Amino acid sequence: MNIKSSQTLVSEALKEIKTINTDEALTLFNEDKCNLIDIREKGELDKMGRVENSNHIPRGMLEFWLDPDGPYFKSGKLDMNKEMVLFCAGGLRSALAARSLKEMGFEIIK
């Protein structure tokens, strides 16, 4: 069995998505041009805090909550016409999540 490493998956994702820095993400968010999505787990939010007015969608639920045809879709939670800016603690999970949403058809900025 040949298993890809998580680092390989992240490296591949980073080749397919656009990344921006924190200042660029906050500028887009403050100008109301994107949905700022925190994909960290609840325990991380409790420990490290959160960006005010950002949307919290845990990584494990992201695709389910954003699938309009799925039973877990969170209608009205996000403006589905805006770009999705995802962030986590270190950028690895958000890279994989951005790639997944890109595959679903979303316009993504990490």
Feature names for model-found ranges:
Residues 1-52:
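Flexible, polar/low-complexity N-terminal or interdomain linker segments that lie immediately upstream
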Residues 38, 55, 87:
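Active-site-adjacent beta-strand anchor residues
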Residues 46, 64, 95-96:
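Alpha-helical elements of the RecA-like P-loop NTPase motor core of helicases
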Residues 52-53, 71:
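Short glycine-enriched, charge-decorated loop/helix-capping segments at active-site entrances
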Residues 55-58, 62:
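Thiol-based oxidoreductase modules, predominantly thioredoxin-like and allied folds used
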Residues 64-70:
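Short, charged, surface-exposed secondary-structure boundary motifs
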Residues 70-110:
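Catalytic cysteine-centered active loop of the rhodanese-like fold, especially the PTP/DSP P-loop
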